[in-house]
């Protein structure tokens, strides 16, 4: 499919969005339909007879467009030859009310809990999102997690209540669960007409009219009066909508109080403002599978979600540690963030980049300020639904995939080589893996292949780690859950053709400290004929939320600048294996405060060892404790098994957080240590005759009770 790309879309007409959803809320279908209709708009310019359009859609549907790309670009609105020539009622003009063409970049976000990192990473680079909900289930556990992540990044959202054709579909219940379980402020801008098999259309509350679909492909519909039986409800919801708009717009408030009729455009502008301020979530409704409600949803993306100009400038620090920010302006200095690395069979390593400011040119050199290395940008590729397009340059606010960045990984910042004030954008913080598995190749010949493949996979995915166990010499892989590691193993055989044996999943314990220690010394001196070795470092160490931090507080050159990174490296090495049970140490801050060196005998190696010695000693003194992953568990269970299931969770050291009823089942929410959850699926099945289901996802690390910690340390 050839894609006509406008040379440059003004920033106000760009939308960078993601579709966030629970695993089965219908995300793939919704995304496919969006690609279908946006692809269709290109065809519509050429095709002036409705049948051809219908044929094309049927074909496209049979072929099924799927996204394998991390960012896909589509266009919507401003169809040539339809809205522009006044044929508003002709077939084509009905697809979008929007008179100009907008560029929508869709960033793919996975729905499974083991991939929260993927969601975090996409939320970081998108400006707005569509939150998808299943009209039967309403808010599900994963929807809550993703919603909380989107709150953290302050991402404005619109909601789409999908699957209105399903048995048990209940739009109003779904909206209520958004209010109760997410603490959101949902404002329906549409209501469904009918439900389940009788779902035939939508009431547009802004324009106060009904859209009744005439065909299965969602390409033809009639705009009519609102059905009599829905009139009263529509007026009640319209009233709420206007109130929500009035709260955020004084002119609308005045008009509302004086009982004036308010123009739809004015309402949309007020709702847009409230959405961008995260005060409300406009709610749309439809059935992607039945092709209903997708075009109005796309109009909603343009009406209510932000352009790069509507979000605050991206923040970071200069190399001196001063706060800095970059405005979304192509004339400004380049600042770009690599948000995903993907192995691609055709071009090798693809690095997906969001350009926040300035212009990125193919073939140019850039500086990776996170790592302090120069990189050459090879080709720049714009991904569309099923084609790639080469770009010579990419501007602020855009997303692109780059070929040739060999040293750049997820979360790295790229700036111009000659930038006098380079910036390092805020780093992405990824959760610690919670599950370990030993892995070995089936044949000795595969050893080299296996370690290369694992290295490649670890590059792509920051929550997947590979390490060698010091005591056993085994290779250990770690990830966010059993499914995560299963998929990694599947990719090993499928993409890298490596067969491996794996051990049983183990809990990935961590160690940390509980008190500050000062003036801890590491001194490495070796005098054996010829040149000696001399390294001496004095550190303070303290507990520190949010990972490892190293602070250089050396004054007066007592340790030369060149050796300071070596001390940091030595400390990091020491933290890989804690003093209690050899697990990695997390959440500590180390200050390098003093030390000494020898003109002749000092070397990087000596200071690395000194740093490592100081850190090991500090860990012993700083009250080390063992941490274990605690999982948020949700069990959906028929009433009669409630007591039994709750008793079982408590016996697994679980803490019950609360209960809800959902339909005729009860939902129990609990925090349970991962160590107690192995084999839970089988146990739950036998306790409830297979009628209960559960989901679990990592929530936080917590201190292991003393008696259990002692047993773990003895292993």
Curated annotation (Swiss-Prot):
<dbReference type="InterPro" id="IPR005225">
    <property type="entry name" value="Small_GTP-bd"/>
</dbReference>
<dbReference type="InterPro" id="IPR031157">
    <property type="entry name" value="G_TR_CS"/>
</dbReference>
<comment type="similarity">
    <text>Belongs to the TRAFAC class translation factor GTPase superfamily. Classic translation factor GTPase family. EF-G/EF-2 subfamily.</text>
</comment>
<keyword id="KW-0648">Protein biosynthesis</keyword>
<keyword id="KW-0963">Cytoplasm</keyword>
<dbReference type="InterPro" id="IPR009000">
    <property type="entry name" value="Transl_B-barrel_sf"/>
</dbReference>
<dbReference type="InterPro" id="IPR053905">
    <property type="entry name" value="EF-G-like_DII"/>
</dbReference>
<dbReference type="GO" id="GO:0003924">
    <property type="term" value="F:GTPase activity"/>
</dbReference>
<dbReference type="InterPro" id="IPR035649">
    <property type="entry name" value="EFG_V"/>
</dbReference>
<dbReference type="InterPro" id="IPR000795">
    <property type="entry name" value="T_Tr_GTP-bd_dom"/>
</dbReference>
<dbReference type="InterPro" id="IPR000640">
    <property type="entry name" value="EFG_V-like"/>
</dbReference>
<dbReference type="Pfam" id="PF14492">
    <property type="entry name" value="EFG_III"/>
</dbReference>
<keyword id="KW-0342">GTP-binding</keyword>
<dbReference type="InterPro" id="IPR035647">
    <property type="entry name" value="EFG_III/V"/>
</dbReference>
<feature type="domain" description="tr-type G">
    <location>
        <begin position="12"/>
        <end position="309"/>
    </location>
</feature>
<dbReference type="InterPro" id="IPR027417">
    <property type="entry name" value="P-loop_NTPase"/>
</dbReference>
<feature type="binding site">
    <location>
        <begin position="162"/>
        <end position="165"/>
    </location>
    <ligand>
        <name>GTP</name>
    </ligand>
</feature>
<dbReference type="InterPro" id="IPR009022">
    <property type="entry name" value="EFG_III"/>
</dbReference>
<dbReference type="GO" id="GO:0005525">
    <property type="term" value="F:GTP binding"/>
</dbReference>
<dbReference type="Pfam" id="PF22042">
    <property type="entry name" value="EF-G_D2"/>
</dbReference>
<dbReference type="InterPro" id="IPR020568">
    <property type="entry name" value="Ribosomal_Su5_D2-typ_SF"/>
</dbReference>
<dbReference type="InterPro" id="IPR041095">
    <property type="entry name" value="EFG_II"/>
</dbReference>
<dbReference type="GO" id="GO:0032790">
    <property type="term" value="P:ribosome disassembly"/>
</dbReference>
<dbReference type="InterPro" id="IPR047872">
    <property type="entry name" value="EFG_IV"/>
</dbReference>
<dbReference type="InterPro" id="IPR014721">
    <property type="entry name" value="Ribsml_uS5_D2-typ_fold_subgr"/>
</dbReference>
<dbReference type="Pfam" id="PF00679">
    <property type="entry name" value="EFG_C"/>
</dbReference>
<keyword id="KW-0251">Elongation factor</keyword>
<feature type="binding site">
    <location>
        <begin position="108"/>
        <end position="112"/>
    </location>
    <ligand>
        <name>GTP</name>
    </ligand>
</feature>
<feature type="binding site">
    <location>
        <begin position="21"/>
        <end position="28"/>
    </location>
    <ligand>
        <name>GTP</name>
    </ligand>
</feature>
<protein>
    <recommendedName>
        <fullName>Elongation factor G</fullName>
    </recommendedName>
</protein>
<dbReference type="GO" id="GO:0005737">
    <property type="term" value="C:cytoplasm"/>
</dbReference>
<dbReference type="InterPro" id="IPR005517">
    <property type="entry name" value="Transl_elong_EFG/EF2_IV"/>
</dbReference>
<dbReference type="Pfam" id="PF03764">
    <property type="entry name" value="EFG_IV"/>
</dbReference>
<dbReference type="InterPro" id="IPR004540">
    <property type="entry name" value="Transl_elong_EFG/EF2"/>
</dbReference>
<dbReference type="Pfam" id="PF00009">
    <property type="entry name" value="GTP_EFTU"/>
</dbReference>
<dbReference type="GO" id="GO:0003746">
    <property type="term" value="F:translation elongation factor activity"/>
</dbReference>
<comment type="function">
    <text>Catalyzes the GTP-dependent ribosomal translocation step during translation elongation. During this step, the ribosome changes from the pre-translocational (PRE) to the post-translocational (POST) state as the newly formed A-site-bound peptidyl-tRNA and P-site-bound deacylated tRNA move to the P and E sites, respectively. Catalyzes the coordinated movement of the two tRNA molecules, the mRNA and conformational changes in the ribosome.</text>
</comment>
<keyword id="KW-0547">Nucleotide-binding</keyword>
């Amino acid at each position: 499919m050839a894609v006509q790309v406008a040379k440059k879309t003004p920033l106000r007409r760009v939308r960078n969005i993601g579709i966030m959803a629970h695993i089965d809320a219908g995300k793939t279908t919704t995304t496919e339909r969006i690609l279908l209709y946006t692809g269709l708009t290109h065809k519509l310019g050429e095709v002036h007879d409705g049948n051809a359009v219908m044929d094309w859609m049927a074909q496209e549907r049979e072929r099924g467009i799927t996204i394998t790309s991390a960012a896909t670009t589509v266009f919507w609105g401003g169809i040539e030859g339809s809205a522009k020539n006044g044929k508003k009622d002709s077939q084509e003009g009905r697809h979008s009310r929007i008179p100009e063409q907008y560029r929508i970049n869709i960033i793919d976000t996975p729905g499974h809990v083991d991939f929260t990192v993927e969601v975090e990473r996409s939320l970081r680079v998108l400006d707005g999102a569509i939150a998808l909900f299943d009209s039967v289930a309403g808010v599900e556990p994963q929807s809550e997690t993703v919603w909380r992540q989107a709150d953290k990044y302050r991402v404005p959202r619109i909601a789409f209540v999908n699957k209105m054709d399903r048995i048990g579909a209940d739009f109003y219940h779904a909206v209520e669960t958004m209010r109760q379980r997410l603490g959101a402020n949902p404002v329906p801008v549409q209501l469904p007409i009918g439900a389940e098999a009788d779902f035939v259309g939508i009431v547009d509350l802004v324009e106060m009219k009904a859209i009744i679909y005439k065909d299965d492909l969602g390409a033809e519909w009639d705009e009519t009066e609102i059905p009599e039986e829905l009139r009263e409800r529509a007026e009640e919801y319209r009233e709420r909508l206007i109130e929500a708009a009035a709260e955020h717009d004084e002119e609308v408030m005045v008009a509302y109080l004086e009982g004036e009729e308010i123009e739809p455009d004015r309402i949309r502008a007020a709702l847009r403002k409230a959405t961008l301020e995260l005060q409300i979530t406009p709610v749309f409704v439809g059935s992607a599978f039945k092709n209903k409600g997708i075009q109005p949803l796309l109009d909603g993306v343009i009406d209510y979600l932000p352009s790069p100009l509507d979000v605050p400038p991206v923040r970071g620090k200069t190399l001196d540690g001063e706060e800095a920010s970059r405005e979304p302006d192509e004339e400004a200095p380049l600042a770009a963030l690599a948000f995903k690395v993907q192995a691609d069979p055709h071009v090798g390593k693809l690095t997906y980049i969001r350009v926040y400011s300035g212009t990125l040119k193919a073939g140019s050199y850039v500086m990776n300020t996170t790592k302090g290395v120069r990189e050459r940008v090879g080709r720049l590729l714009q991904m569309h639904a099923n084609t790639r397009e080469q770009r010579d340059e990419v501007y602020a606010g855009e997303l692109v995939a780059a070929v040739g960045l060999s040293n750049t990984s997820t979360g790295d910042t790229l700036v111009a080589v000659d930038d006098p004030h380079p910036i390092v954008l805020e780093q992405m913080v990824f959760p610690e893996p919670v599950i370990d598995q030993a892995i070995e190749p089936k044949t000795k010949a595969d050893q080299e292949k296996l370690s290369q493949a694992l290295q490649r996979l670890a590059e792509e995915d920051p929550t997947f780690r590979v390490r060698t166990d010091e005591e056993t010499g085994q290779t250990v892989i770690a990830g966010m859950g059993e499914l995560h590691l299963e998929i990694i193993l599947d990719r090993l055989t499928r993409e890298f053709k490596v067969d491996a044996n794996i051990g049983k999943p183990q809990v990935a314990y961590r160690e940390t400290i509980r008190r500050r220690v000062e003036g801890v010394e590491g001194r490495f001196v070796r005098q054996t004929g010829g040149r000696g070795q001399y390294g001496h470092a004095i550190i303070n160490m303290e507990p520190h939320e949010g990972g490892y931090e190293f602070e250089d507080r050396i004054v007066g050159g007592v340790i030369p600048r060149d050796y300071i990174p070596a001390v940091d490296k030595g400390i990091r090495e020491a933290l890989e294996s804690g003093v209690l049970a050899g697990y990695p140490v997390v959440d500590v801050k180390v200050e390098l405060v003093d030390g000494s060196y020898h003109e002749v005998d000092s070397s990087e190696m000596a200071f690395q060892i000194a740093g490592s010695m100081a850190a090991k000693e500090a860990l012993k003194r700083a009250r080390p404790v063992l941490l274990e992953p605690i999982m948020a568990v949700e069990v959906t269970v028929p009433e009669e098994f409630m007591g039994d299931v709750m008793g079982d969770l408590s016996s697994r050291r679980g803490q019950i957080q609360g209960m809800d009823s959902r339909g005729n089942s009860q939902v129990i929410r609990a925090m349970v240590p991962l160590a107690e959850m192995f084999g839970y699926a089988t146990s739950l099945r036998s306790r409830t005759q297979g009628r209960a289901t559960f989901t679990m996802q990592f929530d936080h690390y917590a201190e292991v009770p003393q008696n259990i910690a002692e047993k773990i340390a003895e292993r």
